[in-house]
């Protein structure tokens, strides 16, 4: 869970991760994340990049099989001026 949140928080296009859930199955894990995206970014591109990075890094760092990564964009953050 912490690895997934750290990956998202290091992406400039992601404002905040609001929820993360990891379910462990016998043959691997499933990750569910909700995030707020910064205004001006293509949501689909950001979510695809986050999904790929999360799967790759968790498999690399933990040697666990990631079965799926489900992402939900819960909102858009607009900078206050």
What are these regions (language model features)?
Residues 4, 43-65:
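Short, non-transmembrane amphipathic alpha-helical segments
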Residues 30-48:
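A short interface-forming secondary-structure element
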Residues 18, 41-45, 81:
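Short acidic, gly/pro-rich beta-turn/loop elements at beta-sheet edges
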Residues 11-36, 73-78:
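Short edge beta-strands and adjacent turn/loop segments
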Residues 7-10, 36, 57-59:
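Preference for short coil/turn "hinge" residues that link or interrupt alpha-helices
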